[in-house]
Amino acid sequence: MKLSDTDIRRYMAEGRIAIDPVPGEDAIGAMSVDLQLGDSFRVFVPGKVSHVDLAPPGGIKGRDIEALMGHVEVGENEAFYLHPGEFALGITIQRVRLPADVAGRLDGRSSLARLGLMVHATAHTIDPGWDGRITLEFFNCGPLPLAMRPGMRICAISFEALMSPTSKPYAASPTAKYKDQLAPLPSRLASDQSA
């Protein structure tokens, strides 16, 4: 069951869903909450490795991923520029905490998509039990560079109540790769292969 704005306000008032900083009333839509862009990004650094082997037997190495992506901080009143065909990771300002019986769904803004900005390449589900800021997977599929500024409304999160709590809340899992993230983290695919 999707939560309406009334449900979202009630869940937040009860402490079942936490969003920090707390969104203003203007950020709460009919069934979602707008989230803002943070100031931290990860970008691919060309020429660091020859390729990324996504599957065994070669397997991906954690050090290769770290070498692939550089970290960029954008200052106050500055913009991060995403050029056509480029991919980058970003992060929300807000930290989101979900209970074991609520999942989140991340959606890009239609107005930004109409200018060529994809906000999540694949990862739109926020698992029950999540606690942290949300990494965004940006891709510019338009013809012009896009200037993205920290603090701008970048996406919306909606919520679904599960019929029962999951037995595997994300933050409680010892193998959760991205729990408590405060900055955009590069892929941790290598930890899948070592498990």
Swiss-Prot record:
The biological pathway it contributes to is: Pyrimidine metabolism; dUMP biosynthesis; dUMP from dCTP (dUTP route): step 1/2
Which keywords has UniProt assigned to this entry?
Hydrolase, Nucleotide metabolism, Nucleotide-binding
Q: Which cysteines are joined by disulfide bonds?
A: none
Active-site residues from the entry? E137
Kindly list the GO molecular function terms attached to this UniProt entry.
dCTP deaminase activity; nucleotide binding
Show the catalytic activity.
Answer: dCTP + H2O + H(+) = dUTP + NH4(+)
InterPro entries named in the record: dCTP_deaminase, dUTPase-like_sf, dUTPase_trimeric
A biological process (GO) of this protein is: nucleobase-containing small molecule interconversion
Catalytic activity, EC: 3.5.4.13
Q: At which positions is dCTP bound? A: R109, S110, S111, L112, A113, R114, D127, T135, L136, E137, Y170, K177, Q181
Which family does the record assign? Belongs to the dCTP deaminase family.
Assembly information from the UniProt record: Homotrimer.
Name of the protein in its database record:
dCTP deaminase
Native source species: Rhodospirillum rubrum (strain ATCC 11170 / ATH 1.1.1 / DSM 467 / LMG 4362 / NCIMB 8255 / S1)
